[in-house]
UniProtKB/Swiss-Prot annotation:
Bilirubin reductase is a key enzyme in the human gut microbiome. The enzyme is essential to human health, as excess serum bilirubin can cause jaundice and even neurological damage. BilR is nearly universally present in the gut microbiome of healthy adults, while the prevalence of the gene is much lower in patients with inflammatory bowel disease (IBD) and in infants, especially during the first few months of life when infants are most susceptible to developing jaundice. It comes from Clostridioides difficile (strain CD3). The lineage of its organism: Bacteria, Bacillati, Bacillota, Clostridia, Peptostreptococcales. FMN binds at residues 93, 213, 296. Its EC number is 1.3.-.-. The gene is bilR. The record marks 255 as: Important for catalytic activity, assists active site Arg in protonation of C4. The keyword Cytoplasm does not apply. Its cofactor is FMN; [4Fe-4S] cluster. The active site is at residue 166. This is Bilirubin reductase.
Length: 364
């Protein structure tokens, strides 16, 4: 019944057993909790799990793991091995923050620990951080992406995803990037930072597929400040494909409110299932590479239809698989009526991260 959803697909030289993946998700879990969560999702039959926010630098968050050092590599190897043993492939979302980490550390030392206050300082400082970053630091970050990609290969990751939001997306954005050198201004210049990261990774790890998380912002109404405009998508897609990207994971750009990028059930604009697919539609116009769609996806019938109609080649879900890790197994078994459907309340997942409370799902 769901022959397209369950059909294998090849990304670069990597064959995935079906079209369903677990989206990169920050969960604030301890190592053993992460291993258990990812194992449960993998055992249900998803083809790919993308580990979100794999830092290219040491992290100051207690439960965050960096792939920049040996200790972090050993921890990631435990996760990767468990996912492989549970039947799924695994991708590392290489990530770099778009704020001055030292500034945030100093802010916290001054006693400012409120999440809202720190978030405001982070967001308010993005434009200056991007615009004034020295070229030596740009080159250093590009090298860190390359080194971390090599570490990911050594650990056993099957794919690399470049986090094209945050720092990379902010460099791509005409809102945040006001540089007047070769890294700012035109589409060609604003794509340069991402392009050099892609090229450096491709040169270092020639045999691992590169997925690009493509962040697109919307106008009228305005949502998102990082990323590129719909009118700029063609240029960026063709440029990145020419440099060796093997697939695109398409979503709304960040730096709007969290409830916009992870929309709740009562969002005024992103109400419907597949709410970000219109962004994937634009990317599909300009490439034959696999395109992964996201945004309130939960209905097997809906997902089957968008794959069969060539709107996307894959889907990536987070909240639905957190609500019911056996979603895909129930689809395979014809037990769709038994699926615990995500209600998109965000109460124990996205909201829990903001309040630093226990991550989970109200349906558990």
């Amino acid at each position: 019944m769901y022959c397209n959803l369950l059909k294998p697909i090849k990304i670069g030289n990597l064959e995935l057993k079906n079209r369903v993946s677990f989206a990169p998700t920050s969960m604030g879990l301890k190592l053993e909790e992460k291993i258990k969560k990812f194992s449960d999702i993998a055992k249900s039959g998803v083809a790919l799990i993308t580990l979100g926010d794999v830092s290219i630098r040491p992290s100051f968050h207690k439960v965050a793991i960096s792939l920049s050092d040996e200790d972090g590599g050993m921890k990631y190897k435990k996760i990767v091995d468990e996912i492989h043993n549970s039947g799924a492939k695994v991708s590392a979302q290489l990530f770099c923050s778009d704020y001055d980490v030292n500034l945030i550390k100093d802010t916290m030392k001054m006693g400012i620990t409120s999440h809202d206050e720190i978030k405001k300082i982070m967001n308010d400082g993005v434009k200056d951080y991007i615009t004034n970053m020295p070229k030596e630091e740009i080159k250093n970050i590009i090298n860190l992406f390359k080194v971390t990609a090599l570490n990911a290969k050594k650990v056993g990751f099957d794919m690399i995803q470049i986090h094209g939001d945050r720092l990379v997306g902010s460099f791509s954005s005409s809102i945040f990037n006001n540089r007047n050198d070769e890294y700012g201004g035109t589409c060609d210049n604003r794509s340069r930072f991402a392009s050099e990261i892609i090229s450096s990774i491709r040169d270092e790890v020639k045999d691992i597929p590169i997925d690009y998380k493509f962040a697109i912002r919307q106008e009228n109404p305005h949502y998102g400040n990082a990323g590129v405009l719909l009118s700029e998508v063609e240029y960026f897609v063709k440029k990145f494909e020419s440099l060796g990207v093997n697939s695109f994971h398409v979503t709304l750009a960040n730096h709007s409110k969290l409830e916009d990028t992870i929309p709740t059930n009562n969002h005024p604009y992103f109400k419907d299932e597949g709410c970000f697919l219109y962004l994937a539609d634009e990317v599909k116009k300009h490439t034959n590479l696999p395109v992964c769609g996201v945004g309130k996806l939960s209905s097997p019938d809906f997902i089957e239809s968008i794959i069969s109609n060539n709107r996307v080649d894959m889907v990536s879900m987070s909240r639905q698989l957190l609500a019911d890790s056996n979603w895909l197994q129930k689809v395979k078994d014809g037990r769709v009526d038994e699926i615990k459907k995500c209600c998109y309340c965000n109460k124990k997942c996205a909201d829990a991260l903001q309040t630093r409370s226990q991550f989970g799902c109200i349906l558990d």
